[in-house]
């Protein structure tokens, strides 16, 4: 019997773990590992918290969102309700996630932003990806990194920034700063969700004009299928997927998929904003529809990765984790 282990780290307070443990003698095959972590995803925005077996375990009311794939994932898991981020801020959290260090040690005490003091992942730090690489894994990173300070190192325009002006957030990560990730499809930070861009392993830029979580899940599926011989099929793999949504903005259909927005567009705001201190009359209250639509879209993108694992027969020997950098308050952002 092979071991299957699923992990779900939700917001600042959920840790789910599933698997039937095989006898030690049967665990000779190294498991694959996939770690998916959307940005700015609130703990309450998971539908299963309102379902039997879960709602009794928490002291909050869940948001009225549709997350069918996370619901199923949680049902197959042991859910812990008190996991938390030591630093629920984008870049510092990522530094701690990668290195296991507190932000004052990882090199990233602040969000990586060119208008602030330099904050950037230490090149000499041993990251989790370095450990996997040294253990014989093929390592791949997809999506938002936000762990490097913007510098003039555009691979296609040496000596220039990745934008025509000094970017506030976005940055290119060269090979020597990738910490064991031998497959790369990533960017620093860029918040146009339907107009994303990525740099690949060789530093080529791609502008796919596709909602970023669905594009990234498609690239992960391609990697799993080993299209283009991008990984060694004899090696186990370690994958990290840094989805940007449901990070702001959440103002219009430029920020989410219309099919997901349609699930919420006709619902009264009073029924969407269920926290007792929420003010549905605020101008920004309308953002809840777009935020929840992004949550549902991220759920769908995550489901595509799970479907590919099952289709390829990789699901029984793959550890899957879902985590979030930090929560958000849609009407306050």
Describe the predicted segments one by one.
Residues 4-13, 20-327, 333:
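Formylglycine-dependent sulfatase
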């Amino acid at each position: 019997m092979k071991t299957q282990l699923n992990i779900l780290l939700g917001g600042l307070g959920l840790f789910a773990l599933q698997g039937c443990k095989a006898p030690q003698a049967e665990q000779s095959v190294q498991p694959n590992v996939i770690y998916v972590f959307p940005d700015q995803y609130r703990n309450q925005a998971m539908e299963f918290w309102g379902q039997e077996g879960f709602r009794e375990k928490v002291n909050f009311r869940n948001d009225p969102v549709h997350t069918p794939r996370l619901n199923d994932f949680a049902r197959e898991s042991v859910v812990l309700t008190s996991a938390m981020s030591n630093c629920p801020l984008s870049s510092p959290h990522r530094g701690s996630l990668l290195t296991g260090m507190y932000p004052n040690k990882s090199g990233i005490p602040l969000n990586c932003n060119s208008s602030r003091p330099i904050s950037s992942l230490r090149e000499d730090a041993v990251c989790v990806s370095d450990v996997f690489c040294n253990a014989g894994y093929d390592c791949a990173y997809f999506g938002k990194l936000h762990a490097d300070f913007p510098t003039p190192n555009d691979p296609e325009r040496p000596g220039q920034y990745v934008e025509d002006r000094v970017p506030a957030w976005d940055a290119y990560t060269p090979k020597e700063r990738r910490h064991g990730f031998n497959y790369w499809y990533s960017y620093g930070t860029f918040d146009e969700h339907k107009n994303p861009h990525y740099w690949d392993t060789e530093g080529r830029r791609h502008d796919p004009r596709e909602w970023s979580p669905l594009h990234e899940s498609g690239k992960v599926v391609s990697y799993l299928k080993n299209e283009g011989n991008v990984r060694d099929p004899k090696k186990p793999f370690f994958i990290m997927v840094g989805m940007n949504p449901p990070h702001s903005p959440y103002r219009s259909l430029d920020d989410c998929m219309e099919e997901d927005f349609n699930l919420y567009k006709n619902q009264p705001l009073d029924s969407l904003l269920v926290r007792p201190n929420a003010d549905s009359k605020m101008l920004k209250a309308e953002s809840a529809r777009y935020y929840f639509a992004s949550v549902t879209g991220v759920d769908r993108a995550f489901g595509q990765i799970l479907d590919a694992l099952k289709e390829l027969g990789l699901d029984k020997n793959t550890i899957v984790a879902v985590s979030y950098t930090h929560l958000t308050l849609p009407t306050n952002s």
